[in-house]
Amino acid sequence: MRILLDNISIIPVSGSNSFIEKGYLLIEDVFIKELGTGKAPEGEFDHIIDGENQVLLPGFINAHTHAAMTLLRGYADDLPLMEWLENKIWPLEAKLTPEDIYWGTMLAIVEMIKSGTTTFNDMYFCMDEVARAVELSGMRAVLARGMVGVGPESEQAIEDSRELIGKWQGQAGGRISFRLGPHAPYTCPPAYLERVMQLSDELQAGIHIHVAETRVEYEDILKQYGKTPVSHLESLGLFQGRQVLAAHCVHLNEEEIGILHQYQVGVAHNPESNMKLASGIAPVPRMLESGIAVALGTDGASSNNNLDMLQEMRSSSFLHKVNTMDPMVLPAYQALEMATANGAISLGMGNELGRLEPGYRADMIIMNLKEAHMTPRYDLLANIVYSAQASDVNSVIIDGKIVMENREIKTFDEQEVLAKARETARKLVGK
């Protein structure tokens, strides 16, 4: 398959804030073959896209989410995290069937595709169903079966993870990858994390874990183990020689920032979820300054309440400007890097995703520049980060395949997904 995108603005996110005003990009099979300015190459193409009044950029990478929690969107709001989890979310999650998880994930995929996300990093359960949804839809995903180290499910989570990695690692042409998902240091005792580390080494699988999301967690870990969460995990050896993505990292001291940098731990910043749950403000400018690959995530739709990475970019930039009282903090290009290149680096995929460069996987989005809120256009990067809306995402290409064109999803029936999701939600709450 050869696809030519011509007469289009291009933001490659290649380490500088430069962009191509009018150019072309050629896709061959699943890879970017070439891109540049001026006249496009001649030849035979399976598909040609005229990019007049549009911009091409890497697909967004949602570095931390719980996709099927779209089914819980709006079910419980305006509550503290632990009350929200223990009294509302966990009891309803206990009712979810594998089929529910499938349709909840498909609903999330509709929302993500239509807002420009091409890869998501997911932690949940019934992950066979999540993988099945990813395979069908054409999305790319890094998946982890959530593992809680206390209670009757702890052993099953180990066995499920082993089986899932054996079954799904590298499937769907490499669009599906799996890692281990120990939930958090407060739900996974040291002995359990030791087993997770052993399995990680045995299967050569990365780790996705929540870390230091709330002040209560931070203080409880300090009281229980005499160390802060990041220091506690370092003392156990969790970061040593493993590809680790730590979600949230809201409450950190300078020593912990140094530890994360030392071990090249990726961090998923979830600004809107952290704001909504009043968890705190992560020290993102300091982490970026230290060289940590800070990516962006939405968390689950039940605590956000959407999966829109354009909103996360805008929110992250604005949040840290006001928190530092410095309008120059986290400028537009840096926010875009967090949503693309840093997302790839944080997941150990920095050499194949997150940029538009020859040899990289052909994961990209085309955005419309014609609407009133995108006019005038003095600064293209600023318009994308500060003005764009999900509805501006016109087309999506993942692994060299057109997944959405002119706002129409090509790989599955969007209306069927919406109908099934509504039916599932009614069943869950008995309405």
UniProtKB/Swiss-Prot annotation:
Q: Where does Zn(2+) bind?
A: H64, H66, H210, D299
Q: Which Pfam families match?
A: Amidohydro_1 (PF01979)
Q: Cofactor note, please?
A: Binds 1 zinc ion per subunit.
Reaction catalysis annotation: S-adenosyl-L-homocysteine + H2O + H(+) = S-inosyl-L-homocysteine + NH4(+); S-methyl-5'-thioadenosine + H2O + H(+) = S-methyl-5'-thioinosine + NH4(+)
**UniProt entry keywords in alphabetical sequence:** Hydrolase, Metal-binding, Zinc
Instruction: Identify the EC number(s).
Output: 3.5.4.28, 3.5.4.31
Source organism, top-level taxon: Bacteria
* Classification via InterPro entries: Amidohydro-rel, Deaminase_MtaD/DadD, Metal-dep_hydrolase_composite, Metal_Hydrolase, MTA/SAH_deaminase
GO MF assignments? 5'-methylthioadenosine deaminase activity; metal ion binding; S-adenosylhomocysteine deaminase activity
Sites where the protein binds substrate: E93, R145, H183, E213, D299
Q: What class of enzyme is it?
A: hydrolase
- Which coenzyme or cofactor does it need? Zn(2+)
Biological function: Catalyzes the deamination of 5-methylthioadenosine and S-adenosyl-L-homocysteine into 5-methylthioinosine and S-inosyl-L-homocysteine, respectively. Is also able to deaminate adenosine.
Report the family membership. Belongs to the metallo-dependent hydrolases superfamily. MTA/SAH deaminase family.
The record's section on PANTHER family has: AMIDOHYDROLASE-RELATED DOMAIN-CONTAINING PROTEIN, AMINOHYDROLASE SSNA-RELATED
Give the protein's recorded name. 5-methylthioadenosine/S-adenosylhomocysteine deaminase
The organism's taxonomy opens as:
Bacteria, Bacillati, Bacillota, Clostridia, Eubacteriales
GN (gene name): mtaD
